[in-house]
């Protein structure tokens, strides 16, 4: 629907273009050229424009005296004589920014809901050190990232990487 409306407006603009005020070099025939006007995206890019004073801090902060930089909206098309948009170097970044703006929300983060696991622990069996309790009762088993960290630390202790007993 939006594309249809935009094409409709462009067609009307092309048909109703007049020769009034179009004096000078490089004149275009009546109705020969129509520009598609789109609202600027909310993404902006900091573009260095040369000169002295300014920098990224606006003359007050970091980069004073190293040239001016302006914040411009990201446009779909950049031409050397236009003052709108960014250089073609940022074309990939522009595509990614448009995709991120147009992408639907993914919702909340994916969470793996595991049931709580209670393990009965007895005092029998090999003991790894005096720091570990005898283990009568029940403990809750680690889940997710905690389980990975716990298993890696246990693997390290089994391979002889544990600290001295102090």
Curated annotation (Swiss-Prot):
Secretion signal span: 1-17
Disulfide linkage: none
InterPro entries cross-referenced by the UniProt entry: Chorion_2
Keyword Chloroplast: no
GO CC, alphabetical: egg chorion; extracellular region
Compartments (UniProt record): Secreted
GO-annotated biological processes: chorion-containing eggshell formation
Record key words, sorted: Secreted, Signal
Pfam families in the record: Chorion_2
UniProt similarity note: Belongs to the chorion protein S15/S18 family.
Function: Chorion membrane (egg shell) protein; plays a role in protecting the egg from the environment.
Name of protein: Chorion protein S18
